[in-house]
Every structure is written in C-alpha cells, then in structure tokens.
C-alpha cells in the first residue's frame, strides 16, 4: 500500500499536462430580472484555498479573498444602483460525484478529506477559532467541511452584507445565466504553488482535485474514476512503468491501492530530468525545513538536501523523493 506517495503520480501527471502557471478564478455574475429583482451568482472554478478576508498576496492559502471579491462585487452593484440581491452559488464544476473510492471508510470523522468542490475556504478546515498564524503552515488536522462550496457561499454572503449589500432569503445552489460575464473576479495562487501546498501538507482534497482538473482537461469522465483513468493515461503516455499499479484514487487514502518502487523511482527521475515535472519535484517537503518531512531528520547536516513525499496509513509508512 503506497499511502500518500501515490500523490506523486497524480502530481506528475497534472504537472506534465496542465498549465501550471495558470490560476483558478472565483467570480460573481449578475442577472437582473424582469420583476426588478437582482440575482447574484457566486461561481467557483476550483479554488479550494479561498480566504475569508482580503486577498493575501503573501500566501498560497488565501491568495484570493472572499472579502476582496465582496468589495469589488458591491462596488459593481452600487454602480448599477443595486443594494439588495438574491444570492446563489454555482458548484457545478465537478458534477455530482465527489467521493473517490476508498476514502469514506478510512475517514469517518472527516479530518482527511473534504469533498472536491468548485470553491472552499482554507480547504474546508474548521479551526474553531484556533487558526494558525501562518495560513500556509500547520501540522494538525481539524474537522473538514462536507459542504465546502456552500460554506464558502455563506461566508461571501456575510462579507457582502458587511459592505452594504442586503442578501435576501437563504443562499441556495443555482447556475450562471447563459450569455453573462462576471462583474468581479479574484484569482488563486498558481497551480504550481497550489501543488506545492498539496504535496507539503499531503492534502488529500487537493490531490483529488488535481486529478479532477486533469480529467476535465483531457475530456475524460467528470468523476473520481475519470480522474484515476486520466492519471494512468498520462503516466503510460510518458513511458512511466505502470506494471503492478492499482490506483483506487488520486490521493493514496485507500487500503487497496498498490504500486511498485520502480514506478515511484520512475516518477522522481522524470520530475528531475524533464521540465514538465518540475512543479511536482520542487513542491515536495524539504526534510528539516518544511512540510510533512520537516521533523524527519537524524543528521542536521542533511537539512535542506532531501525533498520527500511521506506516506502514512495504518501500519504503512512510505517515502519517495530526491536528494540534492
């Protein structure tokens, strides 16, 4: 059982295929109805690291802030003479199938996986007021939301109200009207930065999301199964050995996944020798410094020389990476 070292396969496939310099936008759309009411749609495009306040250029987690989006939206609404709206959120990006095989059985308390969503605040983490000082650095696992997009929409509604726009009725799901353009947008950190965050925190939700983004890019099935198929497809196309590979999901949070050390080594070699895998290589935890491998060091002279992806699942402990 590879545990979270499986994430290196997903990371390589995504980095080799997607535009890793691109960002994920969260947007608002306005529909002005014939009865004189205004319907505002909050649409996510995959940013599961939204912040609750102003956009934060200094961090990956919170790079795009719902407070900033609310301020820009409120300004656009007031310019149109609108001071009250009905708010809905569009969470249609990843369809209806959000739970990969193998995860529910291993995560009954919802501390290792938040369902893949078009948007989420801080990956769906609920800190109960004990938020870490640095949003990019933490080592504990709080309970995760099972409805991250809805909770992001509720935060946005609050921020909009604070900026003088009344939100009528409860916040429900809806769709962006055809032919409309966004009135406000905030952008995530780059996919390259998000991948580093995913690998260093061994974030299962983001690992599964990279698989889903890859599947959408390749026009594969919009499902966890489509994500797995897409990763396997890219590995095979790139000549990476998949002999003995059983990939239950994209994160490794599954008891029945299997892969060989040969495949792990193949992936690491490609990361180091091809530009397309650099994001997956550079994002690994740095032993002695950052990520899940920060405290796995016996010799202080080795600090900073080893980049590693750790894996831990029950009695299983695994590791893969590279040495400078």
For the regions a language model picked out, list residue spans one by one.
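Active-site-proximal beta-strand/loop segments in catalytic clefts of secreted hydrolases
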Residues: 43-46, 89-92, 123-124, 172-174, ...
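Active-site-adjacent loops and short helices of periplasmic peptidoglycan-processing enzymes
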Residues: 1-142, 146, 164-196, 200-206
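C-terminal soluble interaction/assembly domains
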Residues: 243-324
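A small/polar active-site loop signature that marks catalytic segments
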Residues: 124-278
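Short, mixed-charge aromatic SLiMs
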Residues: 31-45, 222-225, 233-237, 286-298
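Short, solvent-exposed secondary-structure boundary motifs
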Residues: 18-21, 232, 236, 309-314
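Short, well-ordered secondary-structure micro-motifs
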Residues: 52-53, 99-100, 209, 221, ...
């Amino acid at each position: 059982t590879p545990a979270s070292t499986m994430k290196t396969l997903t990371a390589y496939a995504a980095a080799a295929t997607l535009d890793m310099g691109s960002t994920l936008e969260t947007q608002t759309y306005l529909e002005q109805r014939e009865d004189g009411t205004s319907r505002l749609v909050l649409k996510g495009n995959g940013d599961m690291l939204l912040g609750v306040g102003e956009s934060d250029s200094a961090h990956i987690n919170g790079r795009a802030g719902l407070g900033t989006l609310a301020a820009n939206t409120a300004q656009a609404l007031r310019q149109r003479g609108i001071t009250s709206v009905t708010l809905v959120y569009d969470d249609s990006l990843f369809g209806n199938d959000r739970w990969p095989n193998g995860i529910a059985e291993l995560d009954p308390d919802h501390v290792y996986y938040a369902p893949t969503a078009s948007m989420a605040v801080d990956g769906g983490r609920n800190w109960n007021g004990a938020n870490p000082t640095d949003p990019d650095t933490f080592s504990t696992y709080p309970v995760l939301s099972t409805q991250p997009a809805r909770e992001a929409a509720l935060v946005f509604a609050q921020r909009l109200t604070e900026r003088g726009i009344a939100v009528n009725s409860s916040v429900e799901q809806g769709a962006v009207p055809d032919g409309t353009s966004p009135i406000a947008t905030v952008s995530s950190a780059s996919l390259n930065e998000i991948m580093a965050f995913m690998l260093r925190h061994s974030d299962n939700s983001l690992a599964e999301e990279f698989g889903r983004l890859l599947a959408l890019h390749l026009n594969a099935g919009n499902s966890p199964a489509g994500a797995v198929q897409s990763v396997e497809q890219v590995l095979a196309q790139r000549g990476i050995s998949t002999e003995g590979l059983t990939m239950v999901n994209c994160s490794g949070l599954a008891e029945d996944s299997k892969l060989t050390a040969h495949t792990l080594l193949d992936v690491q070699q490609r990361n180091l020798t091809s530009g397309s895998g650099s994001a997956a290589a550079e994002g690994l935890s740095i032993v002695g410094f950052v990520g899940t491998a920060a405290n796995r060091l016996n010799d202080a002279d080795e600090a900073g020389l080893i980049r590693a992806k750790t894996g831990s699942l029950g009695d299983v402990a695994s590791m893969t990476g590279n040495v400078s």
